Amino acid sequence: MPSQQSLPDFVQAMDAAGFLVRITDEIRVDQIPVTLEANPTKAVLIEKIKDCEFSVLANAYSNQDMYAWAMECDRTQTGRKMVEKAKSRAKWEIVETAPCKEVILKGDDVDLTRLPLFLHHDRDGHAYTNDNLFISKHPDTGVYDWGIYRSMFRSKNEKSVDMTCTSHRQRIHAMAAAAKGQNLEVAMVIGGPILDKISALVGVPGDTDDFEVLGGFYGAPAKMVKCETIDVMVPANAELVLECELMATEGMSFDEGPYGEYTGMYGGGMKHNYRLKVKAMTYRKNPIYQHCTIGGMHPWYTDNMLQLPAIEADLYGALRLAGIDVMEVRSPAGGLSNIAYAKIRPLGAGDAKQALGLMLTCSKQGLPKVAMVFNDDVDIWDDQAVLAAMAFRYMPDRDTVLIKDCNTMTVDPKCAEPGVASKIGMDCTKPMGAGWNPDEFIKSAVTDLGEPPADLKPLTEDEIAREMEAFIGAEPRAWLDILKHFHGQPYKFIYGAFGSLRHKLGRMNDAPWYRYTLSDRPFAFEAKPAALSNFDPRHVGSGPA
C-alpha cells in the first residue's frame, strides 16, 4: 500500500480491490444506520447526504480480508506482520500545510452540526463520532499517543469522550494534566486509511512516540502538520480534525453513553466521563466523513473488529518473546475480540499452559477473556477443525487455566465490577509425557492408493492367497500394506484370499498399525482381557510382542 494515503485515494483503492459499495442516491442522515446494516461485509460510501456537505464512508476496516489487504499479506499472517512492522521506527517530518486545512472554522464558527450526525443504535445516549483517533502529548514527557475512543455529541462545540479504561494512555495523559492543574490539548482526527488505524492499536511501551511507529508501518517518515489553536501535531493525511480542550480539571463528571458497543450490546450503560470543548474544526473541501460501524445485528462485521489484528499481534509477540514456538494466532470474528486461538509447536509439556497465561494477560486491549491453544496440525482458521480439537484434546479438569481479577474492557456486561473479569484458557493440544500414547491422537486420514500399475499381471484368487501368505510371512503387514501390494487386482479376489488365510493370522501389539502376522492365535502376543477403560482404547494388556 502507498504510504500515508489520503482518504479519497484510500476509497479509490478499496473500490479497485472490490471492497466498496457506492450509494449514489441522496439519503437523509436518519437513513444512514439501516443503509450500513444492509451491507455488513463491504465498505460503504454514501455519496450524497441531504442538507450536508459531507459524504459518508463506513465499514472500511470491518473484516480480516481488509486487514490482510492493507498489510499486504495473507490473513493468517496479519498478527505476525504487525509485530514485525511495530519494531521499526521512523522520525516524523513537519509540513507547512495539508488538505485538512482547506476549510478552517474557529471559535464561534465551530459547529458540529455540520457533520452528518445520526443515532446509530436505538438506545444510544446521543449521536456519536467514533472513527476518532485522539492525539495528545504526555504533559510531562511530550511523547505523542494516539488511540481510538468513542465520543458523544453535547452541543455544537462540546463532546463527551469515554476514557473509563484505566490502562488507556489518553486517560493517563488527562490524569497527568489534572495533577498539574491543567486541561489537556487533544486533536481528534476523523478519516484515514486502514494502515493508520492498525498502527494506532499496536501495543508499545508508554514512552514510545506513536507517530514514529506509524512511520515504521509506512516504511517512511509520517508527515505531520500543526493544529491551528492547540500545540498538537496531526498526520497530514487527516480528512477532518477537531481541535479540542479536554477538561481534565473537571474530572470524569459528565454523562456519556450508553452506546451500542462492539459486544453487540449496550455495554457500560451511562458513564461518568470527560467533557471536551471544540476550539476549531478543519477539513478538506468536498470532505468525506468516516464513521466506524459497531454493534448492530452483525457485530462480527463492523469496524470495531479492527481489534482483531491488534490482539493477534499482541499475543503473537508475547508468545515469541517467551520462547513459545508459535506459528499463528487468530482472534475469530464471532468472538468479538474476546476469544483467541494460538497454533504452537510445544517443546515441553508446560508450553501450552504457559502460552495460555500469556494470551490472557499480555494485550494492552485487556482482551481476550477466552484463550485456546492448539497443535500445529490444527487449522485454527477452520472453525470445524477448532471444535473437533476442543472436543477430544481438551479435558476440563486437567487442561483449564483460570485467572481471576484481570483487566478487561468496561463495556463487558457480564462484569460485576467494570473493567475486571475472570479469564479462562483451554489447552487443546495433544498431551505429552510417558503416560500418554501419541498414536491415539493421530488423525484418521482417508485411504488413497492412487492409480494401479500399468504393467499389472492379473492373478487368480488362489495365486493372490499364496502370494499374500508369503508377503505376510516375510514380515508383519498392515492391511494398507497388503492393499498396496495387490493394488489393481480384483477386490473380491483380494478379500477372498485374505479370508482364506484369516485362521493363520494374528495381530501384533505394535501401535498404531497392529499388523497381521502368521500366528496360530488371534493375538500374536501375551494378551489378557482388561477391564474397559477410556485410558486404554485397545482394551488389552501391553505384554511383549
Model-derived features with residue positions:
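Extended, highly charged
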Residues: M1-R275, K279-G488, K492-I494
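Non-catalytic nucleic-acid substrate-recognition regions in nucleic-acid-modifying enzymes
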Residues: L483-P544
